[in-house]
Amino acid sequence: QAGYGNCQACCTGGQAGPPGMPGNPGRPGNPGAPGIPGNPGRPPVQPCDPIPIPPCKPCPQGRPGPPGPIGPPGEPGTPGNPGAPGNDAPPGPPGPKGPPGPPGKAGAPGAAGQPGANAPSEPLVPGPPGPPGPTGPEGPPGPNGAPGHPGAPGAPGEKGPRGQDGHPGAPGNAGHPGQPGQPGPPGERGVCPKYCSMDGGVFFEDGTRR
Protein backbone atom coordinates (compact mmCIF):
# COMPACT_ATOMS: atom_id res chain seq x y z
CA GLN A 1 0.00 0.00 0.00
CA ALA A 2 1.35 3.39 -0.93
CA GLY A 3 2.23 5.74 1.87
CA TYR A 4 3.47 3.04 4.26
CA GLY A 5 7.18 2.43 4.43
CA ASN A 6 9.39 2.78 1.36
CA CYS A 7 7.31 0.65 -1.09
CA GLN A 8 7.26 2.67 -4.30
CA ALA A 9 7.86 -0.24 -6.69
CA CYS A 10 4.80 -2.19 -5.56
CA CYS A 11 2.27 0.52 -6.60
CA THR A 12 1.40 0.91 -10.28
CA GLY A 13 0.24 4.18 -11.78
CA GLY A 14 -3.48 4.64 -12.56
CA GLN A 15 -5.00 5.59 -15.90
CA ALA A 16 -4.42 9.05 -17.28
CA GLY A 17 -6.95 11.61 -16.09
CA PRO A 18 -9.11 13.72 -18.43
CA PRO A 19 -7.41 16.69 -20.12
CA GLY A 20 -7.43 19.82 -18.02
CA MET A 21 -8.95 23.17 -18.91
CA PRO A 22 -6.83 25.38 -21.22
CA GLY A 23 -4.69 27.85 -19.34
CA ASN A 24 -5.03 31.64 -19.40
CA PRO A 25 -3.33 33.48 -22.29
CA GLY A 26 0.23 34.55 -21.51
CA ARG A 27 1.54 38.09 -21.34
CA PRO A 28 2.57 39.80 -24.60
CA GLY A 29 6.25 39.37 -25.39
CA ASN A 30 8.85 42.12 -25.45
CA PRO A 31 9.39 44.03 -28.73
CA GLY A 32 12.05 42.46 -30.93
CA ALA A 33 15.38 44.03 -31.86
CA PRO A 34 15.51 46.36 -34.91
CA GLY A 35 16.31 44.58 -38.18
CA ILE A 36 19.52 45.00 -40.16
CA PRO A 37 19.63 47.59 -42.97
CA GLY A 38 18.35 46.33 -46.34
CA ASN A 39 20.40 45.78 -49.50
CA PRO A 40 20.84 48.69 -51.94
CA GLY A 41 18.21 48.90 -54.67
CA ARG A 42 18.76 47.84 -58.28
CA PRO A 43 19.53 50.43 -60.96
CA PRO A 44 16.48 51.70 -62.89
CA VAL A 45 15.58 49.77 -66.05
CA GLN A 46 13.86 52.71 -67.82
CA PRO A 47 15.87 55.71 -69.07
CA CYS A 48 15.99 58.86 -67.00
CA ASP A 49 14.07 60.93 -69.57
CA PRO A 50 10.56 59.50 -69.99
CA ILE A 51 9.44 58.79 -73.54
CA PRO A 52 6.46 60.94 -74.43
CA ILE A 53 3.34 58.86 -75.02
CA PRO A 54 1.02 60.16 -77.74
CA PRO A 55 -2.40 61.13 -76.41
CA CYS A 56 -5.21 58.65 -76.91
CA LYS A 57 -7.92 59.27 -79.44
CA PRO A 58 -10.86 60.83 -77.66
CA CYS A 59 -13.69 58.38 -77.16
CA PRO A 60 -17.15 59.22 -78.51
CA GLN A 61 -19.56 60.82 -76.12
CA GLY A 62 -21.67 58.30 -74.23
CA ARG A 63 -25.42 58.23 -73.90
CA PRO A 64 -26.99 60.75 -71.58
CA GLY A 65 -27.57 59.38 -68.12
CA PRO A 66 -30.97 59.11 -66.47
CA PRO A 67 -32.42 62.32 -65.06
CA GLY A 68 -31.31 63.01 -61.54
CA PRO A 69 -33.62 63.45 -58.58
CA ILE A 70 -35.50 66.73 -58.14
CA GLY A 71 -33.36 69.19 -56.27
CA PRO A 72 -34.48 71.13 -53.21
CA PRO A 73 -36.46 74.35 -53.83
CA GLY A 74 -34.33 77.44 -54.30
CA GLU A 75 -34.29 80.49 -52.10
CA PRO A 76 -37.19 82.94 -52.56
CA GLY A 77 -36.45 85.73 -55.02
CA THR A 78 -36.55 89.43 -54.31
CA PRO A 79 -40.00 91.10 -54.40
CA GLY A 80 -40.91 92.51 -57.83
CA ASN A 81 -41.87 96.07 -58.71
CA PRO A 82 -45.48 97.15 -58.11
CA GLY A 83 -47.72 96.54 -61.13
CA ALA A 84 -49.61 99.21 -63.11
CA PRO A 85 -53.16 100.05 -62.00
CA GLY A 86 -55.79 97.82 -63.67
CA ASN A 87 -58.69 98.92 -65.88
CA ASP A 88 -62.24 99.33 -64.61
CA ALA A 89 -64.16 96.07 -64.54
CA PRO A 90 -67.35 95.74 -66.66
CA PRO A 91 -70.68 96.06 -64.84
CA GLY A 92 -71.81 92.83 -63.21
CA PRO A 93 -75.06 90.97 -63.91
CA PRO A 94 -78.30 92.26 -62.30
CA GLY A 95 -78.79 91.14 -58.73
CA PRO A 96 -81.59 88.85 -57.52
CA LYS A 97 -85.15 90.12 -57.13
CA GLY A 98 -85.73 91.78 -53.78
CA PRO A 99 -88.51 90.92 -51.32
CA PRO A 100 -92.03 92.37 -51.94
CA GLY A 101 -92.68 95.78 -50.46
CA PRO A 102 -95.29 96.58 -47.81
CA PRO A 103 -98.97 96.76 -48.98
CA GLY A 104 -100.19 100.18 -50.12
CA LYS A 105 -103.03 102.22 -48.64
CA ALA A 106 -106.64 101.26 -49.46
CA GLY A 107 -108.15 103.19 -52.38
CA ALA A 108 -111.27 105.35 -52.24
CA PRO A 109 -114.64 103.53 -52.61
CA GLY A 110 -116.05 103.54 -56.13
CA ALA A 111 -119.41 104.83 -57.33
CA ALA A 112 -122.57 102.70 -56.95
CA GLY A 113 -123.24 100.44 -59.89
CA GLN A 114 -126.35 100.06 -61.98
CA PRO A 115 -129.03 97.60 -60.75
CA GLY A 116 -128.64 94.19 -62.27
CA ALA A 117 -131.09 92.60 -64.70
CA ASN A 118 -133.59 90.01 -63.49
CA ALA A 119 -132.51 86.44 -63.88
CA PRO A 120 -134.40 84.42 -66.47
CA SER A 121 -136.97 81.95 -65.15
CA GLU A 122 -135.70 78.37 -65.47
CA PRO A 123 -137.00 75.09 -64.08
CA LEU A 124 -135.33 73.73 -60.95
CA VAL A 125 -132.47 71.37 -61.73
CA PRO A 126 -131.20 69.07 -58.93
CA GLY A 127 -127.62 69.74 -58.07
CA PRO A 128 -124.83 67.16 -57.95
CA PRO A 129 -124.77 64.73 -55.01
CA GLY A 130 -123.09 66.04 -51.92
CA PRO A 131 -120.02 64.50 -50.25
CA PRO A 132 -120.53 61.28 -48.26
CA GLY A 133 -121.64 61.75 -44.69
CA PRO A 134 -119.74 60.63 -41.60
CA THR A 135 -119.46 56.93 -40.80
CA GLY A 136 -122.47 55.59 -38.90
CA PRO A 137 -122.33 53.55 -35.68
CA GLU A 138 -121.29 49.91 -35.83
CA GLY A 139 -124.19 47.52 -36.50
CA PRO A 140 -125.06 44.46 -34.42
CA PRO A 141 -123.06 41.27 -35.04
CA GLY A 142 -124.45 39.02 -37.76
CA PRO A 143 -125.43 35.37 -37.33
CA ASN A 144 -122.73 32.71 -37.07
CA GLY A 145 -121.47 31.41 -40.37
CA ALA A 146 -121.55 27.82 -41.53
CA PRO A 147 -118.82 25.55 -40.07
CA GLY A 148 -115.74 25.33 -42.23
CA HIS A 149 -114.43 22.22 -43.93
CA PRO A 150 -112.12 20.01 -41.86
CA GLY A 151 -108.48 20.91 -42.33
CA ALA A 152 -105.83 18.65 -43.79
CA PRO A 153 -104.02 16.35 -41.32
CA GLY A 154 -100.93 17.97 -39.85
CA ALA A 155 -97.40 16.71 -40.27
CA PRO A 156 -96.34 13.94 -37.84
CA GLY A 157 -94.65 15.31 -34.75
CA GLU A 158 -91.14 14.50 -33.64
CA LYS A 159 -90.50 11.23 -31.84
CA GLY A 160 -90.99 11.68 -28.12
CA PRO A 161 -88.52 10.57 -25.46
CA ARG A 162 -88.43 6.89 -24.52
CA GLY A 163 -90.89 5.98 -21.81
CA GLN A 164 -90.12 4.03 -18.68
CA ASP A 165 -89.90 0.26 -18.92
CA GLY A 166 -93.17 -1.51 -18.15
CA HIS A 167 -93.69 -4.18 -15.52
CA PRO A 168 -92.50 -7.64 -16.54
CA GLY A 169 -95.30 -9.76 -18.00
CA ALA A 170 -96.61 -13.01 -16.63
CA PRO A 171 -94.63 -16.16 -17.54
CA GLY A 172 -95.84 -17.84 -20.72
CA ASN A 173 -97.32 -21.29 -21.07
CA ALA A 174 -95.01 -24.30 -21.13
CA GLY A 175 -93.96 -25.31 -24.64
CA HIS A 176 -94.65 -28.63 -26.31
CA PRO A 177 -92.06 -31.40 -25.73
CA GLY A 178 -89.37 -31.48 -28.41
CA GLN A 179 -88.71 -34.23 -30.94
CA PRO A 180 -86.66 -37.22 -29.67
CA GLY A 181 -82.95 -36.84 -30.28
CA GLN A 182 -80.76 -38.95 -32.52
CA PRO A 183 -79.52 -42.22 -30.98
CA GLY A 184 -76.10 -41.85 -29.41
CA PRO A 185 -72.99 -43.70 -30.58
CA PRO A 186 -72.25 -47.13 -29.09
CA GLY A 187 -70.46 -47.03 -25.76
CA GLU A 188 -66.86 -47.98 -25.26
CA ARG A 189 -65.89 -51.33 -23.88
CA GLY A 190 -65.93 -51.65 -20.15
CA VAL A 191 -62.79 -51.59 -18.07
CA CYS A 192 -63.80 -54.53 -15.87
CA PRO A 193 -62.00 -57.79 -16.71
CA LYS A 194 -63.93 -60.73 -17.98
CA TYR A 195 -62.24 -63.16 -15.62
CA CYS A 196 -59.03 -63.49 -13.63
CA SER A 197 -56.67 -66.48 -13.61
CA MET A 198 -55.01 -68.11 -10.65
CA ASP A 199 -51.55 -66.79 -11.58
CA GLY A 200 -52.71 -63.19 -11.43
CA GLY A 201 -53.50 -62.60 -15.13
CA VAL A 202 -56.47 -60.40 -16.03
CA PHE A 203 -58.37 -61.05 -19.29
CA PHE A 204 -60.68 -58.51 -20.99
CA GLU A 205 -63.42 -58.91 -23.60
CA ASP A 206 -61.30 -57.45 -26.42
CA GLY A 207 -58.72 -60.20 -25.93
CA THR A 208 -56.10 -58.11 -24.15
CA ARG A 209 -54.51 -59.30 -20.94
CA ARG A 210 -52.54 -57.61 -18.21
Curated annotation (Swiss-Prot):
Q: Which domain of life is it from?
A: Eukaryota
**Gene Ontology cellular component annotations, sorted alphabetically:** collagen trimer
* Annotated segments matching region Disordered: 11-210
MF annotations from Gene Ontology:
structural constituent of cuticle
Pfam families in UniProt: Collagen
Keywords on record: Collagen, Cuticle, Repeat
* Bias kind Low complexity: ranges: 105-122, 167-179
- Which residues lie in Pro residues bias regions? 40-76, 88-103, 123-144
Has keyword Repeat? yes
Note the PANTHER family from the entry.
COLLAGEN, CUTICLE COLLAGEN 34-RELATED
Q: What else is known?
A: This protein shows 4 potential triple-helical regions, which contain glycine as every third amino acid.
Q: Which family does it belong to?
A: Belongs to the cuticular collagen family.
Q: What does this protein do?
A: Nematode cuticles are composed largely of collagen-like proteins. The cuticle functions both as an exoskeleton and as a barrier to protect the worm from its environment.
Official protein name in the record = Cuticle collagen 2C
| Species of the source | Haemonchus contortus (Barber pole worm)
Q: Which gene encodes it?
A: 2C
